[in-house]
Amino acid sequence: MNLKNPETPDRNLAMELVRVTEAAALASGRWVGRGMKNEGDGAAVDAMRQLINSVTMKGVVVIGEGEKDEAPMLYNGEEVGTGFGPEVDIAVDPVDGTTLMAEGRPNAISILAAAERGTMYDPSSVFYMKKIAVGPEAAGKIDIEAPVAHNINAVAKSKGINPSDVTVVVLDRPRHIELIADIRRAGAKVRLISDGDVAGAVAAAQDSNSVDIMMGTGGTPEGIITACAMKCMGGEIQGILAPMNDFERQKAHDAGLVLDQVLHTNDLVSSDNCYFVATGVTNGDMLRGVSYRANGATTRSLVMRAKSGTIRHIESVHQLSKLQEYSVVDYTTAT
């Protein structure tokens, strides 16, 4: 390889990456509704780690399962892939919505995002971010520092609807009580979700969904993954880091981060050559979940590439005998 001109991600990478999220969804799918989120998440991590190392790339996990001493696999800074091919930053969430998965509730998904090496934002252990995300019609029209009503009116105008027809998806958390009140005072509707704000943001950017905006404070890693999706869909995300304690504030200071800076889509992912891949674990607004039958299973995935603007919906039929290769989980029974 010419180190001065390393390979850049190409269209083939997207189809390799979807195999990774399919494996994670299949591994965690057997744990849906069983009330065991750690076991289900662990199965997804195992499967994702196994499959991601078969992908032709020189990947580095930028957004993973935690620091090296906290996560045995898919930790921040871990090198993944075959060691050949394009050099990429990787962001993973083997199960976005572990509680949703454990309780058998909608919108649990397995996610992987990728971009050219060195182009993903590193939040330096600041785990939360105030966020707003919208679809293509309202991109460039929102301002995270403006009042809630301003953004609702801007989205309504850009979509040609009344503010009363705008639906805002918000994580159901005590910290959002005032935000929810502001949304309703502006005349808009609120859709509360218990987990999974990546799925909420993607739903807001899809024409076929009845969600128009995602607002609120959620995970910074999810914000970066969402930025990859917005790049692919033509939407927009804005964020402001929201450290929860002095330790996070110090980590941000040590890393040279500006806490009151508005982070735009391009700040979170600076490359236009990026990918977003997701496979449904449970049925949801964005994707249907894994469905099992006697001799195998079916998965539904969303595969997007920003450079080409291509969005693919993929339904895959998997043979039961092959599923056993993905994880230690027994796919024949829910043990």
UniProtKB/Swiss-Prot annotation:
Mn(2+) 1 binds at residues 41, 65. GO terms for biological process: fructose 1,6-bisphosphate metabolic process; gluconeogenesis; glycerol metabolic process. One of its GO terms (molecular function) is manganese ion binding. Its EC number is 3.1.3.11. Optimum pH is 7.7. It catalyses: beta-D-fructose 1,6-bisphosphate + H2O = beta-D-fructose 6-phosphate + phosphate. Mn(2+) 2 binds at residues 93, 96, 222. Pfam families: FBPase_glpX. Inhibited by the monovalent cation Li(+) with an inhibition constant of 140 uM. Also inhibited by AMP and phosphoenolpyruvate and to a lesser extent by phosphate, fructose 6-phosphate, fructose 2,6-bisphosphate, and UDP. ATP and ADP have no significant effects on FBPase activity. Pathway: Carbohydrate biosynthesis; gluconeogenesis. Gene3D superfamilies: 3.40.190.90, Fructose-1,6-Bisphosphatase, subunit A, domain 1. Disruption phenotype: Strains lacking this gene are unable to grow on the carbon sources acetate, citrate, glutamate, and lactate and display no detectable fructose-1,6-bisphosphatase activity. It is found in: Cytoplasm. Homotetramer. Catalyzes the hydrolysis of fructose 1,6-bisphosphate to fructose 6-phosphate. Is essential for growth on gluconeogenic carbon sources. Also displays a low activity toward glucose 6-phosphate, and fructose 6-phosphate, glycerol 3-phosphate, ribulose 1,5-bisphosphate and myo-inositol-monophosphate are not significant substrates. This is Fructose-1,6-bisphosphatase class 2. It comes from Corynebacterium glutamicum (strain ATCC 13032 / DSM 20300 / JCM 1318 / BCRC 11384 / CCUG 27702 / LMG 3730 / NBRC 12168 / NCIMB 10025 / NRRL B-2784 / 534). The gene is glpX.
